[in-house]
Amino acid sequence: MGVRNCERRAGLVEAGGTTPGSAQRTEEGPPMNTTAQSRSMQAAVVTGPGRITIKTLDLPEPGPNQVRIALEGCGVCASNLTPWAGPDWMTFPTEPGGLGHEGWGVVDAVGSAVTGIAPGQRVAALSYHAYGTHDLAEADAVVPLPASLAGQPVPGEPLGCAMNIFARSDIAAGQTVAIIGIGFLGALLTQLAVKAGAQVIAISRRPFALELARRMGAHTTIAMDDHWRIIEAVKALTGGQMCDRVIEAMGKQWPLDLAGELTRERGRLVIAGYHQDGPRQVNMQLWNWRGLDVINAHERDPKLYVSGIRAAIAAMEDGRLDPTPLYTHVYRLEELDDALNATRDRPDGFLKALVTYP
């Protein structure tokens, strides 16, 4: 399935108004202008729970070791959903462009000390205000994109995240690998594990996701509907040995419980899900008895993020990774609220939202 451009809802709100069940959306300034001659930019600001405004700002100037990027788009990350909901600890309004960290585009200015990167280069970047037409990034957090990827969306951060998780999983040919949760990340990991020669068991709630996993090369798919039925199914598939590697990619308690049950003795349980909603309980008796290696595959070193982005670009070039069919929903900047709500609600057929800046 290719990228699907989502039509704007009928009855889209005017400035300051709402439609039933929608987020409040306001717009400030003229329509978006991303021409090379413009000295202004537009950026989304989250003004409160479920509310955005679009602001027109002066273009920022890069510092000595920074580059400025005219962004083509930004992926929408599920980690945005907690601040979008407005928990007590969240402070509003956000900085312009804030929460966006999956941007790609074309360098249009560089700092005085920057070498090796020039205006006109297309790049993926690790930056933190990418819900806007332009953003600044440190020069060492920018990865040039090859000509072979021209025209393709490249939200570098989640692609790099998938590569880093795959590396920490230590997957090899002939292994049996279960992946619990076939969203964007789980689908990428399915591709990578299959290309590495593993036998992949994909487990997900949604029939759409299971069909997608089969297209990604999964050898077996299992509906995530009953804890003990899944365990027995995997036991039958593996001759009672269970799985060499299990990747939990949902960030919830039940998938974490299930992951432990599916991992064989001295196997590796990889936590790839983003757990945001409180403490977790684990079956330490089971983990101890089986001698599991438990890996928290989330990286926090920006240098590792950037190396993951480089690895993802290489994998896209050589065919090990093809994220293009996974970008299911595309929105304009002024529709960022719709993109966040779709990421939260996950309508049928949803996998990954992009916000693009034509």
Segments predicted by a language model, with ranges:
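C-terminal hydrophobic helical "lid"/dimerization subdomain
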Residues: N33-R39, D257-G260, E265, G308-P358
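C-terminal substrate-binding/catalytic core of Rossmann-like NAD(P)-dependent dehydrogenases/reductases
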Residues: I231-K235, G278-T328, D338
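Glycine-rich beta-strand-centered segment in the early N-terminal region that forms part
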Residues: P60-G75, P87-H129, S148
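Mid-domain Rossmann-like dinucleotide-binding core that forms the NAD(H)/NADP(H) cofactor-binding site
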Residues: T19, Q24, Q152-D226
